[in-house]
């Protein structure tokens, strides 16, 4: 009898479950995966090289475009590295705002993940539910920075501006009657902080809805339990971080182990899995959303009681106030010089890592004393996770490869850079 050879199948880069431009070359024995070879580079934009020809502040918007689902956390890692080289202190209020927006971004990311992951596996409803909540958080992004996605809100030394006193409201239009308009603007009558508070008061019920649809769903469990199992030892060896590592039972979270900003003052728990499969990673991320609610509530409470500056008083780094620029020529010149020439960063190197929704996002920054980085190295969590795909998918069906890509929460902006 003739020997049957394995055959190869190209999965992506146009496949809707490939999460962007992933090309997987699968070696199959029937429908069982023998080898999965990810081909990357289709979204390579030379971010690290571009940063070498831009001033330190001009590279902040590039960070938003790495993992374009977790925008502000990318910025956070970058500005932390600059602040370490400059040796400047960030005002306490700015630190609380950063932590608040890190957690808003974590929820944004996990909502996108749960919607896309469920949709890939075949559950449509969760996707629509998740985007209902994402819309409110996108509005918060827009209220503080003017942009729904690429915010450029974190700056070396603090944040772009304090939280506004008014939340933008929906305007009357042909598709909305007055009753619908009043309902949509109900939570928008106060400040941005009031709106965020209202959102996180409502949000636990929304998470309960997602869990009602998925957690004990028989089909969901059949598709996730026992798929893509990673032992704690292998998770460490492969460099997995974030929910991928915690899903395997290792309680490693930079917010607890190497706290930055004001995370050491926050009261929250680190959810940890037991079996290291796709289902455990799902449970870890859902619980992370609940912990983000706790952290956000603590930040809101502190921010209400403690007004103050949100930018460092080091004028070599901080731009002048808008009011000053309108009345004072020196302030206008200062602003122009700062945003065209930038500021010089002392010679040295620094590594700053933040607990990104996907794992450890690190920025290694080398300065030669100029106004531009000498070298910028980005440590993207998704890169190590994608490298583990071959091992996780081996012995599973083609349909399970989709589940494994979903559980890794891959976004190609940060992998290809």
Curated annotation (Swiss-Prot):
Membrane protein topology class: Peripheral membrane protein
One Pfam family cited in the UniProt record for this chain: Complex1_49kDa
Any single Gene Ontology cellular-component annotation: plasma membrane
Alphabetical UniProt keywords: Cell inner membrane, Cell membrane, Membrane, NAD, Quinone, Translocase, Transport, Ubiquinone
Annotated S-S bridges: none
Catalytic activity: a quinone + NADH + 5 H(+)(in) = a quinol + NAD(+) + 4 H(+)(out)
Database matches in PROSITE patterns: COMPLEX1_49K
Entry EC no(s): 7.1.1.-
Enzyme kind, highest EC tier: translocase
GO molecular function, one term: NADH:ubiquinone reductase (non-electrogenic) activity
Subcellular location: Cell inner membrane
Reported function: NDH-1 shuttles electrons from NADH, via FMN and iron-sulfur (Fe-S) centers, to quinones in the respiratory chain. The immediate electron acceptor for the enzyme in this species is believed to be ubiquinone. Couples the redox reaction to proton translocation (for every two electrons transferred, four hydrogen ions are translocated across the cytoplasmic membrane), and thus conserves the redox energy in a proton gradient.
Family listed: Belongs to the complex I 49 kDa subunit family.
Subunit structure: NDH-1 is composed of 14 different subunits. Subunits NuoB, C, D, E, F, and G constitute the peripheral sector of the complex.
Protein name, per record: NADH-quinone oxidoreductase subunit D
Primary gene name: nuoD
């Amino acid at each position: 009898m003739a020997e049957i050879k394995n055959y190869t199948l190209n999965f992506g880069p146009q496949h809707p479950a490939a999460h962007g431009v992933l090309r997987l070359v699968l070696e199959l024995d029937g429908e069982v995966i023998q080898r999965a070879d990810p081909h990357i580079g289709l979204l390579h934009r030379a971010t690290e090289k571009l940063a070498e020809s831009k001033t330190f502040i001009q590279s902040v918007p590039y960070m938003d475009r790495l993992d374009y689902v977790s925008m502000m956390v990318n910025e956070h890692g970058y500005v932390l590295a600059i602040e370490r080289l400059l040796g400047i202190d960030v005002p306490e209020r700015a630190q609380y705002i950063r932590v608040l927006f890190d957690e808003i971004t974590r929820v944004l990311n996990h909502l996108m993940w749960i919607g896309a992951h469920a949709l890939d596996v075949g559950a449509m409803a969760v996707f629509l539910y998740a985007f209902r909540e994402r819309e409110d958080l996108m509005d918060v992004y827009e209220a503080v920075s003017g942009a729904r996605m690429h915010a450029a809100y974190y700056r070396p030394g603090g944040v772009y501006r304090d939280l506004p006193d008014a939340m933008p409201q929906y305007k009357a239009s042909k598709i909305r009657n007055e009753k619908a308009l009043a309902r949509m603007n109900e939570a928008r009558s106060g400040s941005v902080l009031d709106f965020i508070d209202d959102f996180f008061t409502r949000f636990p019920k929304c998470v309960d809805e997602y869990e009602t649809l998925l957690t004990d769903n028989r089909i969901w469990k059949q598709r996730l339990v026992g798929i893509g199992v990673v032992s704690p030892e292998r998770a460490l060896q492969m460099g997995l971080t974030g929910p991928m590592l915690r899903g395997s039972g290792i309680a490693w979270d930079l917010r607890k182990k190497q706290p930055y900003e004001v995370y050491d003052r926050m009261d929250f728990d680190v959810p940890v899995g037991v079996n290291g499969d796709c289902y455990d990673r799902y449970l870890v991320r859902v619980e992370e959303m609940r912990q983000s609610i706790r952290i956000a509530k603590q930040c809101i409470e502190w921010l209400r009681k403690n007004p103050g500056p949100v930018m460092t008083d080091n004028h070599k780094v901080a731009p002048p106030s808008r009011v000053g620029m309108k009345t004072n020529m020196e302030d206008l010149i200062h602003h122009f010089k700062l945003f065209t020439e930038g500021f010089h960063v002392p010679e040295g190197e620094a590594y700053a890592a933040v607990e990104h929704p996907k794992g450890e996002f690190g920025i290694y920054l080398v300065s030669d004393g100029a106004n531009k980085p000498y070298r910028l190295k980005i440590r993207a969590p998704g890169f190590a996770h994608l490298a583990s795909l071959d091992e996780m998918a081996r012995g599973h069906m083609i349909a399970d490869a989709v589940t494994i890509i979903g559980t890794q929460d891959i976004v190609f902006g940060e992998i290809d850079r």
